[in-house]
Design a protein with these regions (language model features):
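Generic enzyme active-site microenvironment
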Residues: 40, 163
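Formylglycine-dependent
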Residues: 111-159, 166-263
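Catalytic metal-binding/acid-base residues of hydrolase active sites
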Residues: 44-45, 100-101, 166-167, 260
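Active-site segment of extracytoplasmic enzymes that catalyze sulfate/phosphate-ester chemistry
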Residues: 38-39, 46-147, 152, 206-207
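Long, internal low-complexity/basic segments
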Residues: 23-34, 41, 46, 78
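Proline/glycine-enriched tight loop/beta-turn segments at coil->beta junctions
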Residues: 29-35, 248-253
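Bacterial Sec-dependent N-terminal signal peptides
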Residues: 1-31
């Protein structure tokens, strides 16, 4: 059996964090292309870790213990001049399309189709931003059309897995569905960025008969309903299952792991 290493990367830009984790995955492949795991951590500042992203540790670095991030940095690379938008959708739209918010013009969080999420202000005019998010195909108003790097990976032989928070496009637009972006497997990804409940006891925001209590109800985790399983644990278990299945394929894999709760 050949051991295949995941390329390590540590990236903490302001409010969002992406990590490309290192691990040894045993596969039967002779393909030398790397397996990739990319973590997107929600609402995490550049000082919200014991790993300093400045020339020296700050007071806030001392408040945290994140040994795994320190290990990733030692074994990989750190990028200290990166940028992320201050809220969810713009950052995730940038990641999936490779464009910044000034170009894709998704400048606030998205949810319902053709609905701005800006707070009303009598003193300010609301800009005509792309409140329907991003898409790979034209045809939806107020939507940026771009190419997904996940689609490129898939087209070049990668098995692609999405797990967790998507938040790329509004409800009933092509961009809301991770499959649209080239993911072959989608675990819990949909249009909403928040979640109705973190708890399996509350069916992650569904009633006992399976009806969502709000647009924030987390889909696809029915097997954990009624159990004492926090949503992070449920997503982790599903990601591990998807990776174990992917190891059986004669192709490299890409896992996008986007946990729902803030870090």
């Amino acid at each position: 059996m050949n051991k295949k290493k995941l390329f390590p990367l540590a990236l903490v830009p302001l409010a969002a964090t992406s990590l490309q984790a290192q691990s040894n995955i045993q596969t039967g492949r002779t393909d030398k292309r790397p397996n990739i795991i990319l973590f997107m951590v929600d609402d995490m500042g550049w000082q919200d870790t014991s790993l300093p992203f400045w020339t020296q540790k700050t007071h806030y670095n001392e408040l945290y213990e994140t040994p795994n991030m320190e290990r990733l940095a030692r074994q990989g690379m750190m990028f200290t001049q990166a940028y992320a938008s201050s809220i969810s959708s713009p950052t995730r739209c940038s990641l999936i399309t490779g464009t910044n918010a000034a170009r894709h013009r998704v400048t606030n969080w998205t949810l319902q189709k053709n609905t701005m999420t800006d707070r009303k202000n009598k003193q300010l005019a609301v800009p005509d931003w792309n409140y329907n998010g991003v898409s790979q195909v034209p045809g939806t108003n107020n939507t940026f059309v771009g190419t997904s790097f996940v689609q490129i990976l898939k087209d070049n032989g990668y098995h692609t897995i999405h797990c967790g928070k998507a938040h790329f496009g509004s409800i009933d637009t092509p961009g809301e569905d991770p499959h649209h972006w080239g993911f072959e497997v989608n675990i819990a990804g949909h249009a909403a960025g928040g979640l109705a409940s973190y708890l399996g006891e509350e069916n992650y925001g569904h009633t006992k008969d399976g009806k969502p209590v709000s647009l924030m109800a987390v889909p696809g985790l029915e097997k954990y309903w009624g159990t004492e399983t926090f949503v992070t644990e449920a997503l982790t278990q599903e990601a591990i299952k998807a990776l174990n299945k992917a190891k059986k394929y004669n192709q490299p894999f890409y896992l996008y792991m986007a946990f729902l709760p803030p870090a």
